[in-house]
């Protein structure tokens, strides 16, 4: 991606600072390790009271540069220092693959530690976190900076030890889950995360954009009638195209009138949209999504009778991750494997809202400029393209577009065969396991040996990528093709043209295409890239346009069956347009997810803040007497002109509040008393009972009960919000915006949640027994 004017201006500004850093390389040359550590301590102390100047930055970068030269034998070049300065400004640095992002990270992490910040370095997976912690961590430790690796499966004591380090490496999900788990603990001492100061995200586009569609969830099992999934599967398998409508690129499908009638007959209900048929409607819609929108070997893979999600942007299977809200169960029913119980959400947060809690955030990646608008709007981060140290020496060809997949397949085999014969290594990129296996079959038939990398054999990824640059090697890979690792070329491959990259489909995002192209031509190596696509590819199949349908039909009728590609500007323009439309649709989905999550994010922050206060004080923030009085007044005092039917609600609430408690006045007697008198009796009796116990004992009991009830009700509230989110589009009507309806009804549910746990806490206060314990 080329630099724009603003990028060039920023790079020019930092180039001079970077050159001054390089000129300082003699400053620390003669110091031993102890003296370098003294320098580290000097800078740490200085910035506790004074701001950091550009001159300070130059000296600190020079210190880190000297340590890197000694420990790992790498001297940071000017462009790496420019990139680090960009990161220090809270921006995304786009640096081409192989240009040294890992070394670049050293400088910004070191300088943030000098500022007094704890640093979290987030990578795409635990393998990369471990690798980078070992390589760059040793440089930081040489300078007296503590470094740790945040892995899954550690106990609280181990986690707490990790979070005392200055720099912590880990994955986005592990940091996010630690945050969620911290807000489920019962004792303050069990919290592990100690502040969210600065986060540096490697492969920022993958983590902040691609993974943003899947929220982080902590869950347990939810009781449900799983047989409904199998029944709904039978219904959906019988559906014809005229029973439903769908917009595949928006991932949305719905029943038309014919489909509704068929479903109502199948389920034996008068109206599919009645309250009684809520479960049947929900599960029918889930099975429709599973059958018509979710595709095997593209969206998921079945391995050992288990449905595994495929990350659409990396091609990797995601063990342990499940589609939420019942979709995973629907796919299991569709595929005829065991339908496992749906999970119940205990805690959840989106990637976007987790990382937006950090005081400062920076990112680095090989491809980000195409998504700059999203980085700005959601994370308030600009993207700056960092120039390469050596000129990119890769030949990028215009797409070859064929009429049919069959013609495309033949052309790919021909292209690969002559490159294989001359010994040039070739990487063939596919967008799904299905197309990956189809191309593999064609290569087998042509007698071309090759290695295959996809979600089914991801365990061999490092080994496969290590061989991909060898002379004569043909590698067939989905999007997962070794992101974060270099494809190193054999020495004699350079004269053969370097690594050739053949893309077999344009992806839903130009960024993914650029990543594939970026496998070749690293660090000034020669290389070649070309996409060979067809009019029957998924990208164009999803592209709904009357003009495109007419053009496609016309082209296929007139197509010369010589297997040659189409050289038409109009078709190239359609491909570009289709890709842009799908990018826009996917951005809308992510923005939509964030808009809905912002409703619950505000609620989550309020609940977690109250939890923190409870853990901090070890007692209630307000007196139990005040809560009891409010609940009693709410239950017993009502307007005199209240309708008869609403009186029943009041009586029911009064019975629930007093029923089964130690309160000495019977409910029959209570009904004969004045409401205000009842309230005062309840409050005074509780006060008398409470005073029988030591203050610390009763405070601890009340705090524990309150916390327990709040947590239980919060889980129920999250479930209610999921149900609301699922059904809001089905209930949207007229000109009403579903999001506005969700915000309004979500606020009402939150008010109910707060009222409920206060109510049950008041009930519990009236259950105090003579030993100071609460029954039930």
Swiss-Prot record:
It comes from the Bacteria. One of its GO terms (cellular component) is plasma membrane. Disruption phenotype: Cells show reduced secretion of autolysins p60 and MurA, as well as at least 7 other proteins, and are responsible for a smooth to rough phenotype change. These deletion mutants are not as virulent as wild-type when used in mouse infection tests. Large in-frame deletions of this gene reduce secretion of autolysins p60 and MurA, as well as at least 7 other proteins, and are responsible for a smooth to rough phenotype change. These deletion mutants are not as virulent as wild-type when used in mouse infection tests. GO terms for biological process: intracellular protein transmembrane transport; protein import; protein targeting; protein transport by the Sec complex. It is found in: Cell membrane; Cytoplasm. Its main location: membrane. ATP binds at residues 80, 98-102, 486. The keyword Chaperone does not apply. It is a peripheral membrane protein. Keywords: ATP-binding, Cell membrane, Cytoplasm, Membrane, Nucleotide-binding, Protein transport, Translocase, Translocation, Transport. It holds the Pfam family SecA_PP_bind. It catalyses: ATP + H2O + cellular proteinSide 1 = ADP + phosphate + cellular proteinSide 2. Monomer and homodimer. Part of the essential Sec protein translocation apparatus which comprises SecA, SecYEG and auxiliary proteins SecDF. Other proteins may also be involved. PANTHER family: CHLOROPLAST PROTEIN-TRANSPORTING ATPASE, SECA INNER MEMBRANE COMPONENT OF SEC PROTEIN SECRETION SYSTEM. This is Protein translocase subunit SecA 2. It comes from Listeria monocytogenes serotype 1/2a (strain 10403S).
């Amino acid at each position: 991606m080329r630099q724009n004017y603003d990028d060039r201006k920023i790079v020019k500004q930092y180039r001079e600072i970077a050159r001054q850093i390089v000129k300082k390389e003699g400053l620390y040359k003669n110091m031993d390790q102890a003296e370098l550590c003294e320098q580290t301590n000097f800078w740490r102390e200085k910035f506790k009271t004074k701001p950091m100047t550009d001159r300070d930055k130059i000296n600190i970068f020079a210190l880190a540069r000297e340590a890197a030269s000694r420990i790992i034998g790498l001297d940071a070049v000017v462009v790496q220092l420019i990139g680090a300065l960009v990161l220090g400004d809270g921006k995304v640095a786009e640096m081409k693959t192989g240009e040294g992002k890992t070394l670049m990270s050293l400088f910004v992490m070191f300088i943030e530690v000098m500022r007094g910040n704890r640093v979290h370095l987030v990578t795409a997976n635990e393998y990369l976190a471990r690798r980078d912690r070992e390589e760059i961590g040793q440089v930081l430790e040489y300078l007296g900076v503590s470094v740790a690796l945040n892995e899954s499966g550690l106990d609280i004591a181990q986690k707490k030890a990790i979070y005392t380090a200055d720099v912590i490496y880990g994955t986005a999900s592990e940091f996010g889950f630690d945050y969620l788990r911290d807000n489920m603990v019962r004792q303050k001492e069990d919290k592990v995360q100690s502040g969210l100061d600065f986060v540096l995200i490697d492969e920022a586009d993958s983590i902040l954009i691609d993974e943003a569609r899947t929220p982080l969830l902590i869950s347990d099992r939810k009781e449900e009638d799983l047989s409904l999934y199998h029944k709904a599967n039978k219904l959906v398998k019988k559906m014809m195209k005229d029973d439903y409508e769908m917009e595949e690129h928006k991932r949305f499908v719905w029943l038309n009138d014919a489909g509704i009638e068929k479903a109502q007959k199948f389920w034996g209900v008068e109206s599919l949209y009645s309250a009684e048929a809520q479960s049947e409607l929900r599960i029918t819609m889930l099975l429709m999504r599973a059958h018509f929108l979710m595709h095997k070997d593209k969206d998921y893979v079945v391995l050992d009778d288990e449905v595994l999600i495929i990350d659409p942007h990396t091609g990797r299977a995601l063990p342990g991750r499940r589609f939420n809200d019942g979709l995973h169960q629907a796919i299991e029913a569709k595929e005829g494997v065991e339908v496992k119980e749906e999970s119940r959400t205990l805690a959840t947060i989106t990637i976007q809202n987790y990382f937006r809690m950090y005081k400062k955030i920076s990112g680095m990646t090989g491809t980000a400029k195409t998504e700059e608008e999203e980085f700005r709007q959601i994370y308030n981060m600009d993207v700056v393209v960092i120039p390469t140290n050596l000129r990119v020496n890769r030949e990028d060809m215009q797409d070859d577009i064929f009429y049919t997949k069959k013609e495309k397949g033949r052309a790919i085999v021909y292209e690969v065969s002559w490159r294989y014969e001359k010994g040039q290594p070739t990487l063939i990129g596919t967008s799904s396991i299905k197309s990956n296996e189809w191309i593999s079959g064609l290569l087998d038939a042509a007698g071309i040996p090759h290695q295959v990398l996809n979600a089914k054999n991801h365990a061999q990824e490092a080994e496969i990528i290590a061989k991909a640059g060898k002379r004569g090697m043909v590698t067939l890979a989905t999007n997962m093709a070794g992101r974060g690792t270099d494809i190193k070329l054999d020495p004699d491959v350079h004269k053969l043209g370097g690594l050739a990259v053949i893309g077999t489909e344009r992806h839903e995002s130009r960024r993914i295409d650029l990543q594939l192209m970026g496998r070749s031509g690293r660090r000034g190596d020669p290389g070649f890239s070309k996409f060979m696509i067809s009019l029957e590819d998924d990208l164009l199949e999803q592209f709904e346009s009357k003009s495109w349908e007419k053009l496609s039909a016309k082209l296929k009728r007139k197509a010369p069956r010589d297997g040659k590609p189409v050289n038409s500007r109009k078709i190239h323009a359609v491909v570009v347009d289709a890709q842009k439309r799908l990018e826009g649709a996917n951005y809308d989905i992510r923005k939509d997810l964030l808009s809905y999550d912002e409703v619950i994010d505000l609620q989550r922050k309020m609940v977690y803040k109250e939890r923190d206060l409870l853990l901090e004080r070890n007692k209630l923030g307000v007196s139990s007497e005040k809560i009891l009085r409010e609940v009693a007044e709410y239950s017993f005092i009502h307007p005199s002109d209240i309708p008869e039917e609403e009186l029943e609600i009041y009586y029911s609430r009064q019975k629930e509040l007093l029923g089964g408690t130690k309160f000495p006045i019977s409910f029959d007697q209570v009904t004969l008393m004045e409401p205000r008198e009842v309230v005062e009796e309840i409050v005074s009796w509780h006060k008398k009972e409470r005073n029988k116990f030591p203050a610390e004992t009763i405070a601890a009991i009340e705090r524990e009960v309150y916390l327990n009830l709040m947590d239980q009700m919060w889980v129920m509230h999250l479930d209610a919000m999921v149900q609301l989110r699922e059904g809001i589009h089905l209930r949207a009507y007229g000109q009403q915006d579903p999001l506005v309806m969700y915000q309004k009804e979500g606020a009402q549910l939150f008010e109910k949640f707060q009222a409920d746990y206060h109510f049950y806490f008041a009930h519990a206060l009236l259950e105090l027994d003579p030993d100071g314990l609460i029954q039930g």
